[in-house]
């Protein structure tokens, strides 16, 4: 009897120990899955060198008074820019011969493009800003700015770009040109809300701001943004007008010094527009891509399954243990009963 009791006790303990090992192993798999799955969607992101341009193209009208989109495209190609913010872009207007400038520029440069119309029914077409990009454009939206008075409608064109397995928010704007800065300052107050929609993304804010570095507008923007020219620009950086530039009113603003390192900034000479282009080379670290709905759904399913495995095994062990005890008791091999007899 004692021998049978010892054998029954050993068999039960062996099964329990084996069950505990299985539970521990499954818990390890669950932890491993929890650590591994989010990482599947966020690979290591290495910095990339970007060449960025902002350019008020004056509907492709040069200093000679001729509309010539090929001259604009040539300026862009020669700069080797990866991303371009364009202002004063016409689409199908009478004054430019009905040319679809955004589509034509995309064809001439071999880049992706999005267009933001700030004026509809203008000269039989549209007028606004555009963004050219060598990188895929994942989404874009043109925000019409509120105004304090009657005047030309202004806007902020934002595009989320897929850069080196990460993301960048690229923004183009063209603010009011009047001597009174009130409208420009009012426009600036609306920027915070627009960028809050993409708070997790590093951003570039480019365009024709129609104000100088000594202005109140520049002072306000400098509290949240970094002027690329102030980091690496040489000489005066004047961009307006192109024949004899006297003012710096075109800017490339950086949202964070953490994600951006400005290598150099330059103002190439050209007579293709009344503005000169502003070009910067920037070392950029993209933001990791956020996990999308399909990936989140997959993560939830997998983690649910992984969590269920140890629970199921534990339940099986408990049931098996109770069954073994019952069988041992019925056969007279219950270790507790055996021990009490000696």
Where are the regions a protein language model picked out?
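Metal-dependent phosphoester/phosphodiester hydrolase catalytic core
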Residues: 162-184
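Cytoplasmic C-terminal tails of single-pass
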Residues: 324-342
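Metal-dependent phosphoester-hydrolase catalytic domains
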Residues: 160, 182, 195-204, 209-317
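N-terminal, active-site-proximal structural segment of metallo-dependent hydrolase catalytic domains
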Residues: 27, 33-108, 120-125, 286-314
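Surface-exposed cleft-lining segments at the edges of enzyme active sites
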Residues: 59-61, 142-147, 173-181
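Structured beta-strand-rich core segments of catalytic domains in phosphoester-bond hydrolases
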Residues: 64, 83, 89-167, 264-269
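Glycine-biased, low-complexity coil/linker segments
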Residues: 14-15
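Active-site beta-strand/loop signature of hydrolases that rely on acidic residues for catalysis
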Residues: 49-57, 72-98, 132, 159, ...
């Amino acid at each position: 009897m004692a021998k049978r009791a010892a054998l029954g006790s050993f068999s039960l303990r062996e099964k329990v120990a084996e069950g505990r090992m299985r539970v521990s192993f499954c818990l390890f798999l669950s932890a491993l899955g929890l650590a591994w799955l989010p990482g599947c969607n966020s690979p290591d992101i290495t910095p990339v060198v970007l060449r960025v341009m902002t350019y008020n193209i004056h509907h492709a009208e040069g200093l000679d008074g001729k509309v010539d989109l090929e001259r604009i495209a040539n300026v862009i190609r020669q700069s080797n820019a990866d991303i371009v913010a364009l202002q004063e872009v016409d689409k199908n207007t009478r004054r430019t011969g009905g040319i679809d400038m955004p589509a034509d520029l995309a064809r001439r440069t071999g880049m992706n493009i999005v267009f933001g119309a700030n004026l509809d029914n203008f000269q039989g077409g549209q007028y606004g800003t555009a963004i050219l990009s060598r990188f895929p454009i994942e989404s874009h939206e043109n925000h019409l700015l509120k105004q304090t008075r009657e005047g030309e409608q202004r806007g902020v064109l934002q595009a989320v770009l897929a850069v080196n397995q990460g993301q960048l928010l690229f923004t183009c704007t063209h603010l009011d040109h009047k001597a009174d800065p009130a409208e420009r300052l009012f426009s600036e107050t609306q920027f915070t809300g627009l960028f809050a929609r993409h708070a997790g993304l590093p951003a570039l804010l480019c365009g024709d701001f129609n104000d100088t570095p000594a202005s109140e507008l520049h002072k306000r923007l400098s509290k949240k943004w970094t002027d690329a020219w102030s980091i690496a620009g040489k000489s005066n950086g004047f961009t307006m007008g192109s024949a004899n530039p006297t003012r710096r009113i075109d800017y490339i603003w950086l949202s964070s010094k953490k994600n951006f390192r400005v290598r150099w900034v330059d103002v190439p000479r050209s007579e293709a527009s009344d503005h000169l282009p502003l070009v910067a080379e920037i070392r950029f670290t993209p933001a990791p891509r956020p996990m999308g709905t399909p990936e989140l759904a997959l993560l939830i399913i997998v983690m649910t399954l992984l969590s269920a495995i140890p629970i199921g095994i534990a339940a099986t062990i408990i049931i098996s243990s109770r069954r073994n005890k019952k069988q041992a008791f019925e056969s007279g091999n219950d270790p507790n009963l055996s021990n009490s007899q000696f």
